[in-house]
């Protein structure tokens, strides 16, 4: 696991208040600009998670076409990019368009929750195709086994126009 965080104070706060463990063979923390890191690293990743906002909810370079193109270049053959977005921002639709452009249309954004947070996905490799009934069964098992309740998310997907026919395709 590689974590890139631009603010050293965020790393210190995570260690002090959220029990962020020390670096080891499984995890390294790099204090750097995420956009710069993705542009210059030679590492390949199966998964890239992007959740970068400043105090005014601005994303800076983390929501640009060059950044998304660089993310795609850094993903493995079956890689997945997951981006936290704010659907209430006026730039929201353009954010989705940039993702779709960088990934040749292989991007989608889940319906936002009441807070306005929306999670977008972009993929390389083979098509991702899941039946919503399977996702519901997995969500039930997770709730039973871990108390993590993803059933409201599956319910939002069931009412979403991109899941007509009971399939989630990316």
Predicted regions and their residues:
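Generic domain-boundary/flexible-linker signal
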Residues: 12, 59, 92, 130-133
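The AdoMet/dcAdoMet-binding core of the Class I SAM-like
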Residues: 1-77
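Generic structural "secondary-structure junction" signal
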Residues: 20-22, 88, 112, 144
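C-terminal substrate-binding/active-site "lid" region of AdoMet-derived donor-dependent transferases
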Residues: 65-129
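Alpha-helical subdomain
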Residues: 58, 86-89, 103, 163-169
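SAM/dcSAM-binding transferase cores
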Residues: 118-170
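A generic structural signal for alpha->beta connector loops
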Residues: 24-26, 78, 104-106, 147-154
């Amino acid at each position: 696991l590689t974590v890139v965080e631009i603010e050293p104070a965020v790393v210190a706060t995570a260690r002090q208040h959220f029990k962020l463990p020390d670096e080891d063979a499984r995890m390294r923390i790099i204090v750097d600009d995420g956009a710069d890191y993705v542009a210059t690293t030679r590492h390949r990743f199966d998964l890239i998670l992007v959740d970068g906002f400043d105090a005014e909810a601005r994303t800076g370079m983390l929501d640009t076409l060059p950044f998304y193109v660089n993310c795609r270049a850094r993903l493995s053959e079956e890689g997945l990019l997951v981006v936290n977005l704010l659907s209430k921002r006026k730039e929201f639709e353009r954010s989705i368009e940039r993702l779709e452009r960088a990934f040749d249309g292989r991007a989608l954004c889940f319906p936002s929750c009441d807070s306005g947070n929306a999670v977008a996905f972009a993929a390389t490799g083979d098509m991702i195709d899941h039946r919503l009934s399977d996702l519901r069964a997995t969500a039930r098992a997770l709730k039973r086994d871990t108390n993590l309740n993803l059933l409201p998310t599956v319910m939002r997907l069931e009412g979403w126009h991109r899941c007509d026919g009971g399939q989630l395709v990316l």
